[in-house]
Amino acid sequence: MKTLHLSTATDITLAVRIWGDDNILAPTLVMVHGFPDNSLVWQTIAEQLSTIFRVVAYDVRGAGDSSIPKATSAYKIRYLVEDLAAVINAVSPTEPIHLIGHDWGAIQCWEAVTTPLLAGRIASFTSISGPSLDHAAYWMRQGLTQGSMDDKRKILNQLIHSWYIAAFHFPLASQLTWRVAFNKWPQMFSPIQALNLEDFPTQASDGHHGVKLYRANFIERLFKPQPRHTTVPIQLVIPTQDKFVTPALFDYLGQWASR
């Protein structure tokens, strides 16, 4: 593995990790982590995939060794997608890449495949436990206004699973939630999620600043969603033991993704 530091047009420095031999003409796979992780969460699988792909992962702004903007507005999804575009253009300037996103990584990748900035640059997208916020907002609206009782129960179930999002929108509550519930993320959530999570040196900082992702985006997308369609081939991975993202969020994905 090698690490490089990439400066973007908005004066953000991104820590980018690359696995695989640059001299091998292998397809490039870009992996985007979620909250409250950093790119090291991909290390084990990146090492395994590096035999067939040139694997790239980076710390998103506010996480790991990348820049940490102070303003909440700096964490809007459009800036995250600009960061992703900078990484893609740096590591694969001429060839389309394959994209994988988990949690908040998937959320921003949905934006990337449904907006013009990266048109033609993404060969495929694998989404793990993260919907488009716009798609999720439309799903809720349609379910509440036109859906069956079963649809409404699914929405209520998802809202119950998303309890922490409301807490993150209140400064004092979000700090308390993080310190009490999430500061020991691996120890607390490995048993719940049936995962073997590791501690990272920047874990507390990643969580503290990553909360701004929620504050910068959720309310706007919930009340002002935009129709976002894509022709990029999509592979959807739905972990069966995810305690925060329910499968129902993807019930009507076919109306947005044609492949």
Predicted region positions:
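Flexible "cap/lid" subdomain of the alpha/beta-hydrolase fold that forms the substrate-access gate
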Residues: 12-14, 56, 63-100, 107-259
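Short active-site segment of divalent metal-dependent hydrolases/proteases
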Residues: 36, 105-106
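The conserved beta1-alpha1 loop
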Residues: 30-34, 102, 238-239
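Conserved HGGG/HGGXW glycine-rich cap/lid loop of the alpha/beta-hydrolase fold
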Residues: 17-65
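N-terminal cap/lid segment of alpha/beta-hydrolase-fold proteins
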Residues: 1-13
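Generic detector of ordered secondary-structure context
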Residues: 8, 24, 34, 202-206
